[in-house]
From Swiss-Prot:
Subunit structure: Part of the 30S ribosomal subunit. Contacts proteins S4 and S8.
Gene Ontology BP term (one): translation
Protein's gene: rpsE
Role noted for this protein: With S4 and S12 plays an important role in translational accuracy.
Protein name per its UniProtKB record: Small ribosomal subunit protein uS5
Limits of the S5 DRBM domain: 49-112
Family to which this protein belongs: Belongs to the universal ribosomal protein uS5 family.
Entry keyword set: Ribonucleoprotein, Ribosomal protein, RNA-binding, rRNA-binding
Keyword Membrane recorded: no
Keyword tRNA processing on entry: no
Length: 203
């Protein structure tokens, strides 16, 4: 009899455990209701401008902690269709300095005049500081007679036939400014006729 009682109690206890397992409330894991962070994609813009690095210079700055070495980059950009610009950037790395210079150049874009044949309308003289640049029109097929910073400006501006001559100081920044100042002095035949109160045929 005792054995039967023990078996019954064991069976009853097993039934109770099964019932508890079945009737036990299912605890759901807390769902993450916080809004997910949005992922932003960096927009990539295609630029029609070409870049030309004119000069890279290493500069140092003396501080209490010692000398700090950095690089400066001078860049000229243009679309070869009359738009040109220049800029300078500084950073501890050369690529970063070039990127800053390009960004600065995009903020300093100017539009220059040119003939249909890719030359200038007349002789001009540009000056900035002690730098002087003379620009002369050239016949078709001559090419770009220029060097250094002057060539970078006129080539990226879209000129194909032009004579140039640089005099005075040869600091790249001043030469670039002098070249652009000269290009901005151009007058088209219509503008000259208007200033002289004459028709295009009379000029």
């Amino acid at each position: 009899m005792e054995n039967n009682v023990k078996k019954e109690t064991i069976v009853d206890s097993e039934k109770v455990e099964k019932q508890q397992l079945v009737t036990a409330p299912v605890v759901n894991k807390k769902e993450n209701t916080e809004p997910k962070a949005k992922t932003f994609k960096r927009e990539t813009t295609t630029s029609n401008f070409e870049e030309r690095v004119v000069k890279i210079k290493r500069i140092s700055k003396t501080t209490k902690g010692g000398r700090m070495m950095r690089f400066s980059a001078l860049v000229v950009i243009g679309d070869k269709n009359g738009t040109v610009g220049f800029g300078m950037g500084k950073s501890i790395e050369v690529p970063d300095a070039i990127k800053k210079a390009i960004k600065n150049a995009n903020n300093n874009l100017i539009k220059v005049k040119q003939t249909k044949k890719g030359s200038i309308y007349h002789d001009v003289n540009g000056r900035h500081g002690a730098a002087k640049v003379m620009l002369l029109p050239a016949p078709e097929g001559t090419g770009i007679i220029a060097g250094g910073p002057v060539r970078a400006v006129v080539e990226l501006a879209g000129f194909t036939d032009i004579y140039t001559k640089s005099r005075g100081a040869n600091a790249p920044m001043n030469v670039i400014r002098a070249t652009i100042n000269g290009l901005l002095q151009q007058l088209t035949p219509k503008e000259i006729a208007r200033l002289r109160d004459k028709s295009l045929r009379e000029i």
